[in-house]
Amino acid sequence: MTDLITVKKLGSRIGAQIDGVRLGGDLDPAAVNEIRAALLAHKVVFFRGQHQLDDAEQLAFAGLLGTPIGHPAAIALADDAPIITPINSEFGKANRWHTDVTFAANYPAASVLRAVSLPSYGGSTLWANTAAAYAELPEPLKCLTENLWALHTNRYDYVTTKPLTAAQRAFRQVFEKPDFRTEHPVVRVHPETGERTLLAGDFVRSFVGLDSHESRVLFEVLQRRITMPENTIRWNWAPGDVAIWDNRATQHRAIDDYDDQHRLMHRVTLMGDVPVDVYGQASRVISGAPMEIAG
């Protein structure tokens, strides 16, 4: 099977398309290893034409790459919360740059996203390479960020700030009901590649030791660096598409350019580890429990 797999690089810093593979829970271990290697190298990988996948097969395939884990805000409210998280435009549009679930100490290592229902136009997703962003920092900013920590919280989420519908308000109340607060290093060391990556995104509320004005200014500086066009890739979804990204080395955002059409994606996230900074210090839980396997 692996003789048929091809990995086509899509950009100099991020993104690859993998062809010649049929995703599912019965995938050959050698093929899984090739996918994992491509993911670490390219940060986000894409698959076309995976129409055979349903929720069960998506979950089974994701389990070959790691340990599936539900959303911590949902798990905090219900022990039987589903492992698959629906990304449903009815309840909000994640159209600000973020890394998934960084308000938890051991936020997800990776995510597997499948297109379920797509608008007739628009609805693309952008990803940014946070390892490349760190590598391109000037030395003064590297020195600053390597000694900086940030407070991440689910009370400052990434959903649009436009006026909310009743469904969106209800979703936000559920999302924010558990109080998650974690202090992460702004530069974390990737546990598999050893790369240094910038850990920011719109779950950041402030930087430790800085006031609100200083935090806002520095946040904008870092986000501008991370989301430079050269660090990004845009994926235009088609039915049957699947994307997998390394959540430890990327940010992403959906593009809200499909008006009032419906967009539904199903996401499986994989258990992550607690970040450590360049000095070996681990992230600190301020409030809320680390992510756990349901049951």
UniProtKB/Swiss-Prot annotation:
Metal-binding as UniProt keyword: yes
Enzyme class (EC, first level): oxidoreductase
SS bond list: none
Gene3D superfamilies on file: Clavaminate synthase-like
Keywords: Antibiotic resistance, Dioxygenase, Iron, Metal-binding, Oxidoreductase
Induction info: Repressed by the transcriptional repressor Rv3405c.
GO terms, biological process: response to antibiotic
Protein origin, superkingdom: Bacteria
Other facts noted in the record for this chain: Was identified as a high-confidence drug target.
Role played: Alpha-ketoglutarate-dependent sulfate ester dioxygenase, which oxidizes medium-chain alkyl-sulfate esters. Shows preference for 2-ethylhexyl sulfate (2-EHS) in vitro, leading to the formation of succinate and 2-ethylhexanal. Has likely a role in sulfate scavenging in vivo. Also causes the inactivation of the 2-carboxyquinoxaline Ty38c (an antitubercular compound that inhibits DprE1) via oxidative decarboxylation, using Ty38c instead of alpha-ketoglutarate as a substrate. Is thus responsible for primary resistance of M.tuberculosis to Ty38c in vitro. Overexpression of Rv3406 causes resistance to Ty38c.
Protein name per Swiss-Prot or TrEMBL: Alpha-ketoglutarate-dependent sulfate ester dioxygenase
Species: Mycobacterium tuberculosis (strain ATCC 25618 / H37Rv)
